[in-house]
């Protein structure tokens, strides 16, 4: 009997991991060979282009839509929006700004900005974070989510994301606060044009919607 296969590549979103867990629990197969990759943005696009992953999870904004849309079109990929989010700041619950209802960029100037390294594609177009490092005096780049959240706690640092947070994966001492900017993030999936999605991919998309709506 052939093992069912499914692979997804995503930016460092806890809801993407939770949706992956839901798919495995939903099918509860005797055997399977599934893969989830938290990667740099260009790697996600390459994985889906080369059918290494059936789906990718990324975001588009006014700052990166033009560049990434051209890249997706060139690689015969399509972007399907799942939801729109306003940018939020992730900080620890003991942070000096933790009591504020919303946070401004000026509020953050004295604190380290944690971002995910994008390798040779380290530009704002491929950044996972909505705010450019050029807007911050103190910048630290990391490769994995655990390190990022440890530094947020240890250094009173912050990162900028969609605001969808998982206490189980990120820890209960990480909190989310709205960032006071007039912008938004369109989070969605990328897939190959003309490729019929597997039942696992379809279920994964539904699980993503459930975690993000």
Task: Locate the predicted segments by residue.
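A bilobed periplasmic-binding-protein/Venus flytrap-type ligand-binding module shared by bacterial periplasmic
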Residues: 90-98, 186-197
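Beta-alpha-beta core module
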Residues: 74-80, 85-86, 147-194
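Beta->alpha turn/N-cap motifs
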Residues: 40-41, 57-64, 92-93, 144, ...
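Secondary-structure junction motif
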Residues: 16-22, 65, 105, 109-133, ...
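Short, well-ordered beta-strand segments
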Residues: 5-11, 56, 90, 114, ...
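Central regulatory/effector-binding core of bacterial HTH transcription factors
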Residues: 3-67, 142
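Flexible hinge/capping segments at coil-to-helix
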Residues: 71-87, 91-113
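Hydrophobic hinge/microswitch elements
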Residues: 49-54, 119-175
């Amino acid at each position: 009997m052939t093992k069912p296969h499914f692979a997804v590549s995503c930016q460092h979103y806890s809801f993407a991991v939770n949706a992956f867990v839901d798919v495995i629990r939903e099918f509860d197969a005797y055997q399977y060979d599934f893969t989830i990759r938290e990667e740099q943005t260009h790697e996600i696009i390459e994985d889906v282009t080369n059918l290494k992953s059936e789906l990718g999870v990324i975001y588009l904004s006014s700052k990166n839509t033009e560049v990434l849309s051209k890249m997706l079109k060139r690689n015969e990929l399509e972007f399907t929006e799942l939801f729109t989010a306003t940018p939020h700041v992730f900080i620890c619950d003991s942070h000096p700004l933790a009591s504020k209802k919303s946070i401004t960029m000026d509020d953050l100037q004295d604190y380290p900005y944690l971002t995910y390294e994008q390798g040779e594609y380290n530009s704002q177009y491929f950044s996972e974070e909505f705010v450019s490092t050029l807007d911050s005096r103190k910048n630290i780049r990391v490769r994995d989510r655990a390190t990022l959240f440890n530094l947020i706690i240890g250094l009173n640092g912050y990162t900028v994301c969609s605001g969808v947070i998982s206490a189980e994966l990120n820890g209960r001492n990480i909190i989310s606060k709205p960032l006071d900017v007039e912008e938004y993030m369109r989070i969605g999936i990328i897939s190959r044009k003309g490729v019929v999605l597997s039942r696992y991919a379809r279920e994964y998309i539904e699980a993503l919607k459930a975690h993000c709506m």
